[in-house]
Every structure is written in C-alpha cells, then in structure tokens.
Amino acid sequence: MVSISKSLVADICVGSSPPTVRFVTLLENHDISNTTFPSLSGVLAQYGSSLQGPAGLQHVGLAQDQKYQHALTKGLKAVEKLQHFLDGPAPMSGDPVVLRCSSARSSTLLEITDETITSGPPCAGAAREREGITSFHRMKFHLPKHVGCVQDVHETSSQMLHLSCDGLRSEDTLFDRFGRWSRDHVTIVSGMCLFSDKIMRDAVQGDGKLDVSKLSSQEPTLYELEIIARSSSAIADVASHILGKNGAAKPIPLEIVLDAPSWHYFQVVHGNLASGHCTPAEALDWLQAVELRCEQVTTVFENSVRHEMGLRGVPAGFYHILAAPGTAGVGTSIRQALTSGMVPDIADCMDAICEVEGERWAMFYSLIPEKDRPCDFRSLGNLFYIYEVVRPALAAKNGSTAAELEVSGPNSALDDSSSSGHSDILDSALHLKANVERPLIMSIDDRAERKIYSKAQAFIKKIRRAPQIPSHPLLLELYSARRVFINGNTGGDSLYWNDSSPHPLRMNTTAGSPELEAFGVIRNLYGNDCAQNLQRWFSEAGVNVSGHT
C-alpha cells in the first residue's frame, strides 16, 4: 500500500544551477500540540481544530489570519459531510435485519483526525491565487481485515483531502438505515497530464518544426510518477471504502475513469500545420507519439490503482477501470485527416463525436449556450475534460432524440443564475422526471485542476434541473494535498510547469553533491515499493527507464 501517513513533502529549487531538492516534514512531530511552521510560503501545517491566533501565521502575514481560519472551518464542515455521507446513519430500531445491514455497512469507517494543512497563494498574482485558501484534512480509512477472498489486508490508510460540493447536504447519505443505496452507481474520475510543460514546448522548435524524438524517447517525468502515486492511493482508499459497505445488500456498481489527454494536445501543433511550418505527415508522427505516451501512462496508472485496490483486499471483479471512454472519435478523425494529407477540421471532429457518443453527447451539447460552444481544437479539448467528468450522468433512459434535446436549449430551467443552490427547485425538477438515474460521481485530483471540476459542477446542476435528461447526479470534488512544491512555494507554482525531468536533481548546489533522479524523489515520498513498482510498470509499458536503478 502506498503510505502517505507521513506528511513529507519535496521542495524543488528550480532557480539554482543545478536544480536542487529538499524534503520538509509538515505533520510528523506529534509532541507539538497546536501549530508547526514549515518554511513553505502560504502553507500552514497544524494539529488541533483551530488556528492558534495570528502568531501562527507570520509566514503568510497577519492579514491572512481570518481568511485561513475561515478556510479551515469551511473545510472541516465539508469533510464532516463527506464522513456522514460515506459512513451513513445509525440504525433506528432493534430490528435484526436492520442491525445486520448496519453491521455490514460498518465494516469500513472514516475518521477525521486533527491534522490539517491549510494552503493559499503566497502573494498577490501567484499561480495558485485562483485556487484560494484551502484546508486539507487527514482522513483515516479503517478498512476491513477480510474483503472477498483476500485476507492479508492493511487495516488503516490515510489521505490529506479537501472536499468541494455545493450539492451535498448535511443529511445526505450513500445508503439509508435499512442498507439501501441512495445512488444507482458510482464513478470515480481522476486525470493527469503527459510529460511536462517543458518537454511539450521543446518538442516544437522555434521555427515551428516538430521534434518527435523529444517525446518518443522520453523517460517518465517526476510529474507523471508523482501524480500516479498520489492519486492511485486516494482512489483506492475511497473506492475500497465504498465497496466495503456492500455488506448484505446488492453490490453497487463502481467504475474508475482515468482521463489522460491524447488528441487534446493537437492544438499545440495545429497552428504550425495550418501555416505550413510542418507537414501533415510530421504532425501525424507527433500526434502518434503523444497518443502512445497516453496509452503507456494510462496503463501504468491502471496498474497502480489495481495494485492499491489489491492491497486493500478488493478483488478485480468488484470494479471496472476505463480509460477516458468518450474521446475515441476525435482522435480517429484527426488521424484520418492527417493520413490523407489534410489539415483536420473541427467540424469533422464534431461529427465524429456525435457518431460515437450519440445521445450522451447530444444531451451534454444541448446544455451549452451557443456562444460557449467550441470553435477550435483548444476549446474542444478543454470542453472534453469537462465532458468526461459529467459523462456518467448522461445515460439516456427515456428515448429522447438528439433533435428533441436540442430544441429545449440551454435556457429556462437550465439557467443557473436564478436558482443555483436551491435544493427545493432541484427536487421539484427531479419529481418531474421519469425513470431517473441517480449517479454518484467522485473526482479525485490535484487542486490545480479545480477549474475543470467547477465547470463540471455547473453542468451537473443543469442536468439535475433539465426535465429532458433522466438523471439526478451528485458530483463530489475531492482534492489531495500537494506533495511537491517549487521554490519554497514563493510563487505557488505547480510541478507540471516546473519539472526539470529528465535532468536529475541534487541534494544541494555543492559540486559533487549526490544526484536524485525522479524515482529517487518518489522513493523518499512514497516508499521503495512504490518506486520499484512504477519503474517496472513503465518498463513493461515500453517507456525508457534504462537510466534508473
């Protein structure tokens, strides 16, 4: 099991030559009764339920004290809702059937500890300013000793998580006192990027020519390794917790969707192709290198999730893992155009989506105002990230045609401005629907991707109010605490935009100081087993790891 019980984080100094890395412990000294002071700008690590006055915030400025306190209180209330939602209510009678169901559902329990990391933008204009101030609370998952046929199971695992969900009410639970599920199926969605920003930029030369070798021979980047290690553990904890509640009731269907971009990156080279700086054949080679990396990374991601699920005693047959199921049509359309020596057209891609995705896409597209519909590959790629999140909520049951859905348009009952957040209106809309599906969607991702899920949340609200869509979904946004910071977090930058891979890091700038490659950083953060497994899985997927031992 990937262990993140120790709050060890890496701080990479990219401004030094060569880049260096240090490891900072945030929440490990339990002798401290209230607050610790990590040397990371805008980051407050603490024990206890409240901040201990302005003295504890000297590293972010006294003016931030009230904002941090508010974020901590709001975050705690949110995870308390999550705890109640996942663990459910106590039995209300002495009926043996009720007690038996309750006992089965109590096989996994969720505990909120008093360890918290509250982080915010270190200064005005910082990269993370749009994320606001966020509190991550350590949640301990108490797992059953025996699940299915596997007996050697770790009993506890913990995650530093933040929950965002306007639609989750304090009284909501995943199942009632009689063991009946309140949701029809569960989908856990998680995503990641490919390579790093630097590598993607280096693959396009200054004159617009493409250098495919920068992609095809690339070793795993620290970003890719870290996001897989962090996300896999969180996915497995949440999924095994839910599946552990099956008990005597009918098991709830659970899918895990792993969304890594492929054709989404075509927007990087589309302009070069259209202006004649590269040929369709060169663009095709470039795209195929990206698609191969997507396939390889997704395979490793899936292996990591399955490994973590196995450590928690969950048999493979209890869940399904899908790789971005809604994206196939676009990639095929782009490749066909390039193979024919043509510049791909977004209209052809839209036709391909309609053909492959059918009513799901028609329902989704009907919710988009005309002015917000995609007009180029960049906007289409951004839209598809959102579509993959809400896709599980778009299963049609009432036989509505695409034309009927389009007529309704994104207005009237779908307008967020007048009724956002009013559960009575949502419930009224639900009452008008027939054969309603009640899917639960849980996203698990880095906080830097919040924009995607915030927009997906807006679509979820529209779906719940749309009488023509037979679905009443709930989206819970879970974010895991960052484990790698850049330059002491002085700019709030993320690893993807500052990853120096494949170049190794050094422990200090002294000549001859020890080098630490990407797998070494993972070994320090997540343990030797995690690093070895990732190295083996990447090698089996065909990614070069020859430079690592």
Swiss-Prot record:
It comes from the Eukaryota. Its EC number is 6.3.2.-. One of its GO terms (molecular function) is ligase activity. A motif (Conserved DDXXE motif) lies at residues 445-449. It catalyses: L-prolyl-tRNA(Pro) + L-arginyl-tRNA(Arg) = cyclo(L-arginyl-L-prolyl) + tRNA(Pro) + tRNA(Arg) + 2 H(+). Keywords: Ligase. It is an enzyme of class 6 (ligase). Pathway: Secondary metabolite biosynthesis. The conserved DDXXE motif is essential for catalytic activity. This is Arginine-containing cyclodipeptide synthase amaA. The lineage of its organism: Eukaryota, Fungi, Dikarya, Ascomycota, Pezizomycotina.
